[in-house]
Amino acid sequence: MRLPLLLASLLIAGSSLLALADDSATRIGAAADGDWRSDAPGVRRKLTAQDMPAPGATRSAANPSWVVARPEGAWPKAPAGFAVSLFASGLDQPRVVRVAPNGDAFVAESAAGRVTVFTAADGAAKAADKSVFADGLRRPFGIAFSPPGADPHYIYVAETDRVVRFPYRAGDKRAAGPAEVVVAALPAGAGHWTRDLAFSAGGRTLFVSVGSASNAADAMPGAPPEGVAAFAAKHALGAAWGAEENRADVLAFDPDGGGMKVFATGLRNCSGLAIQPQTAALWCVVNERDSLGDDLPPDYATSVKPGAFYGWPWFYIGGHEDPRLAGRRADLAASVTVPDVLIQAHSAPLGVTFYDGAQFPADYRGDAFVALHGSWNRAKRTGYKVVRLIFKNGAPTGEYEDFLTGFVADDASVWGRPVDVAVAHDGALLVTDDAGGAVWRVAYTGR
């Protein structure tokens, strides 16, 4: 009888060890808050609202990174079985990258005011050539093809203060005509200047993200001229006023630019938009506010629900009130939508895409990739990497995993800053890097 008991004990002990190993595989709560030294492909993290510290638990840090030339031998690090190549270099602030149905990659070079198109055969580690598709643009950022699908007729480009479109046929390397203004006036001026674009799955709605004019409604009056109640009765749930009116929002338009509606509010800087193929839901990644401490509040990725209010400026991550605006909109506390995936504070997520390719291992399909531009308001540097959001049956688990790291040179300097991600025609992943003026390509080789 002793042998079966011994075997049972060993099985129980083994199961306990396996459970412990599984628990340690994902860094949860405070353990998920590290710095660049703890980053490595495969490291998983999960944050919840219950993990957040109190406002001011640490001093607000001013810790910007110095951008340096890529050191000799430095290269992005990907998981085992993946190979990283320099797809394109010598770009001027490459930001958003979007891939046309024929495989051409369109990149917004925001500082240069142009959109550049790169061509490459499937499987090619490097772009074969590049052409300027359109120039003379006002800080272009978002790019979208319309109608969605195999045969788009237009390329839409979001400038900082308007949306334009160009006629397009597959293979065009230069716009066939001048820019046609679709949305003549987006909220612009101070604060976040990037504007991203996405079309609904059926192509009937054009979504435009507009970031806030300030960190936490710094210049917004305490109340609108007509009073809060009267203003709220005529505007979307959680709408801001003054210099922040129609900012920190996702706006919705008809494809021709008419029919403007506020789709969702309280998204401080929804810098990247994407449609989830499995559910047709709109997703965005959000840079949350600064100056509340090293680990507060988390940035996030979330599905964007019509009519939802995500908290800014009065609240963050549900009904957690910003102490700088205490009591100003207590009526909204129970109406805040909690985002789906929390990301370490100050990581600065800028771009998001869902993996619908066939090149990566099967468990990647349906997951999302997010480009983290990197922190400045944190004593210990974080971000500066690409992470993978884990989904199960189309729903986020709340976990995310380091996928592409290695862009930090040391405590003071970085040589790369990921901005956006896109799935190439052959299933590889393209990553823009505005610090290095580059586009990186990550391919699965199995070796």
Regions found by a protein language model. Give the residues of each.
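Structural WD40 beta-propeller signal
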Residues: 90, 100, 146-148, 200, ...
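Asp-box/WD-like beta-propeller blade repeats and closely related beta-sheet repeat scaffolds
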Residues: 139-140, 161-200, 228, 232-235
